[in-house]
Amino acid sequence: WTMITNALNTVGKAVKNSSYKVVTRVNLIYGDGINPFPEATNARPKDVFDLQGIDFIGVDAYKDNIKHLKNEVMAYASIAGNYALVAENKGSYANSPSLILTSFALGGGYDIYDLATSNFFINNTTEPDQIDHGIYTWDLQEKEFTPPTRSLIKGLAAAYIDVAKVKPENFAAFNINDNQPKDKLEQLICTTGAQITFQTNNASLGFVLDMHNYLLIYSLNDSQFKLENGKFGETISGRYDVNGTFTKEGTATLENQTLHAKGGVLYKVNYSSQQSLTSNTIENIGNNL
């Protein structure tokens, strides 16, 4: 273990000597969260994180169970200063949108491996049902879950400034209590400042970011968000540009404090909270598993 960590540290330092800014990451592919490895109890993932040449550690989870993934992300996020990236997870998981939303809602990130798997490997393996990891087919055709995965990524990208800095207690993620989204669902989640009731009849996922004086709201499909515990004002649609400025693309109206959200549209709602609330955002991730 000492030999391995010394080697990682040396390589990391060498790379960081580059003339451009470099962030170094090590992927860990086996273990129980950040607990010591069963085969060598003196070896821990945090040993790698503590190396001067390594900036953060991620996990190659290869899990499609939301609760199991939640446990991994929370474990890696518990290391102060670490970015809890799911460094690799199969693109062939049908619930990829739910897995991605889970990771981001808990303060982590998510990489799909891979975009498409070569047909050569699919045809030349003893386990053909295990080798195709692509979010697309080998000939770059969409799989059934490719469009909702793309839609979720676009929503997170549109809100990227706040996705990067919001705390998990203020990232409300809807319809991820199970491994697959419910077709019909009414779900109430509280952030530290807002109470939100989400309704869908089309298996939509959704999220709300509570930024204290405004909310960012997004859903994959047309959905409703009832907003309570505050005064809610101007509502616009748009996205953050490359300079980090929210660019207005349209307007919307709240009806009885309810936003009838169009799928694939990011909304910004100005608000002031009535009183502090106890957040239950984390409890509403994988809670039925």
Enumerate the language-model features and the residues they cover.
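Aromatic-lined carbohydrate-recognition surfaces of secreted/lumenal glycan-active proteins
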Residues: W1-A43, N82-S92
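Conserved, mostly hydrophobic/aromatic
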Residues: V15, I57, S103
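Structural recognition of the beta-strand scaffold that forms the well-ordered cores
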Residues: V23-N27, F56-D60, A84-A87, G109-D114
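Flexible loop/turn segments at secondary-structure boundaries
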Residues: G31-P36, D64-H68, Y93-N95, S118-I122
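Aromatic- and acid-rich polysaccharide-binding/catalytic face
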Residues: A40-M74
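Acidic (Asp/Glu)-rich catalytic clusters
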Residues: D47-L51, M74-I79, T102-G107
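Aromatic- and carboxylate-lined catalytic core of secreted/periplasmic carbohydrate-active enzymes
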Residues: A84, G91-F232, G238-Y240, G244-F246, ...
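C-terminal beta-strand-rich structural cap/linker in extracellular carbohydrate-active enzymes
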Residues: A252-L289
